């Protein structure tokens, strides 16, 4: 993609309304634009990142045996009355009426809808287990939306829901998602620490938040430093191995880890002083087991092996892709701009032509772009008639993993320059060696 043809509305000045790094950089890098309080348009660069985050989430959910669906954003109020949550949810929920005066709502979550879908089709224990998920837009009318997409009113959410015959089977479904989330965050280049959490309006008696550490985190967290180096299960992990998965979950919950809401100072004091870590954290995922909280009032039942009807046991599991984009920036940036992990970078390579219009530079850049794209790498080619300093600033701001710098001086010696954005390391090499060099990392 040529930058001269791309829509990248970069801001030269830091927006006054941006309070945290991710909000500031997302606005400056032309990733998003605010349309109303807590509501954002996703522009091309930001949308590429958002889609890549969703791709990673889908891959890990599919690996764990979950099945993707898509439920309506506008939901019937009657379903929420069945579960008892319509009046309890409060002003966060946007309520509306259609032309026939039927009460509807803009779904902040989808436990009721997915339960209705399940009860209409499942009849027997032989229909279990099931894990259904979607990636769709949600709306919660926050009192004070702030921090850009970190705490917005409209947001993209991956929400999943499991259905099992009993508590033991439901716990295995919970463990599957627990492990798949560890893998998801690892693939995204984030170290997420699972912490016991309050179940809030979702309900239930078992819940974990997945927290990444960041100086601008929204809450204070306390944990054992052991979590910083714990191994994450590999892609080959067997999600059908009940004991094996339980062992992984046990190891990842055996050390102290708590948000400020759940923190117990006396228990934390038992952790060796050198291992205690107090920091700021950002929630990037939340999982719940809530048993029959929804299935009982909504009559989502199946016939068991004994021929008796019983309500199914359920869990729900959320990751916010739009929030994850901001959280990744909070965890990975420097003074010059964003530093994207390879897995979700909008493009792999920033190709910088230092002298547009020079026949040798133009020809070399065309050949390099073709070679990189043939090798399966995505390229954003800066072919603008701008001074080199402006091009370097743009490349650092948008944070693509690699910068390939092509200029007359280097080409005279048959060389180009390669810069790794994360480390700042530079090297010169022959253009023909470039694809293999990048692929080697």
Curated annotation (Swiss-Prot):
Extract the GO molecular function terms from the UniProt entry: ATP binding; proline-tRNA ligase activity
Question: What is the uppermost EC class here?
Answer: ligase
* Compartmental location: Cytoplasm
- GO BP annotation list: prolyl-tRNA aminoacylation
Keywords for the protein's UniProt record, in alphabetical order? Aminoacyl-tRNA synthetase, ATP-binding, Cytoplasm, Ligase, Nucleotide-binding, Protein biosynthesis
Q: Which GO terms describe its cellular component?
A: cytosol
Major location, coarse class? cytoplasm
What is catalysed by this protein?
tRNA(Pro) + L-proline + ATP = L-prolyl-tRNA(Pro) + AMP + diphosphate
Any Pfam family hit:
tRNA-synt_2b
Q: What is its EC number?
A: 6.1.1.15
Subunit structure and binding partners: Homodimer.
HAMAP family hit by this protein: Pro_tRNA_synth_type2
What is the protein's known function?
Answer: Catalyzes the attachment of proline to tRNA(Pro) in a two-step reaction: proline is first activated by ATP to form Pro-AMP and then transferred to the acceptor end of tRNA(Pro).
Family per similarity comment: Belongs to the class-II aminoacyl-tRNA synthetase family. ProS type 2 subfamily.
NCBIfam families with a match to the protein in the record: PRK12325.1, proS_fam_II
Its protein name is Proline--tRNA ligase
Species of origin reads Methylorubrum populi (strain ATCC BAA-705 / NCIMB 13946 / BJ001)
């Amino acid at each position: 993609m040529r930058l001269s043809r791309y829509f990248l509305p970069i801001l030269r000045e830091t927006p006054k309304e941006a309070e945290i790094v991710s909000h500031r950089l997302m606005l400056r890098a032309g990733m998003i634009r605010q349309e109303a309080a807590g509501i954002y348009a996703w522009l091309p660069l930001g949308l590429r990142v958002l889609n890549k985050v969703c791709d990673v989430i889908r891959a890990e959910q599919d690996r764990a045996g979950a099945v993707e669906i898509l439920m309506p954003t506008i939901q019937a109020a009657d379903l929420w009355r069945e579960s008892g949550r319509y009046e309890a949810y409060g002003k966060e929920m946007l309520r509306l009426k259609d032309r026939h005066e039927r009460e509807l709502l803009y779904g902040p979550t989808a436990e009721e809808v997915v339960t209705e879908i399940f009860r209409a089709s499942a009849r027997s224990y032989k229909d279990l287990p099931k894990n259904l998920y979607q990636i769709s837009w949600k709306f919660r009318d926050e009192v004070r939306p702030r921090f850009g997409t970190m705490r917005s009113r409209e947001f993209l959410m991956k929400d999943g829901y499991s259905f099992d015959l009993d508590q033991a089977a439901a716990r295995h479904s919970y463990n599957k998602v627990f492990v798949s989330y560890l893998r998801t965050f690892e693939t995204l280049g984030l170290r997420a620490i699972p912490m016991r959490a309050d179940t809030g309006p979702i309900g239930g008696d078992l819940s974990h938040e997945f927290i990444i550490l960041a100086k601008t985190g929204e809450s204070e967290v306390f944990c054992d430093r052991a979590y910083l180096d714990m191994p994450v299960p590999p892609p080959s992990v067997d999600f059908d191995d009940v004991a094996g998965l339980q062992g992984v979950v046990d190891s990842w919950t055996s050390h102290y880890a708590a948000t400020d809401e759940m923190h117990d100072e006396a228990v934390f004091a038992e952790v060796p002083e050198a291992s205690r870590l107090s920091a700021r954290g950002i929630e990037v995922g939340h999982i719940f087991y809530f048993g029959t909280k929804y299935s009982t009032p909504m009559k989502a039942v199946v016939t068991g092996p004994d021929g008796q009807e019983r309500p199914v046991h359920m869990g729900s599991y959320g990751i916010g892709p739009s929030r994850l984009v901001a959280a990744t920036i909070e965890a990975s940036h420097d003074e010059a701009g964003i530093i994207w992990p390879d897995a979700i970078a909008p493009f792999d390579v920033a190709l910088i032509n230092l002298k547009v219009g020079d026949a040798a530079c133009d020809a070399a850049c065309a050949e390099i772009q073709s070679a990189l794209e043939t090798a399966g790498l995505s390229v954003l080619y800066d072919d603008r008639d701008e001074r080199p300093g402006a091009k370097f600033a743009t490349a650092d701001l948008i944070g693509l993993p690699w910068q390939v710098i092509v200029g007359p001086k280097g080409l005279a010696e048959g060389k180009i320059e390669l810069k790794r954005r994360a480390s700042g390391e530079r090297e010169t090499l022959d253009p023909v060696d470039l694809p293999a060099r990048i692929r080697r990392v």
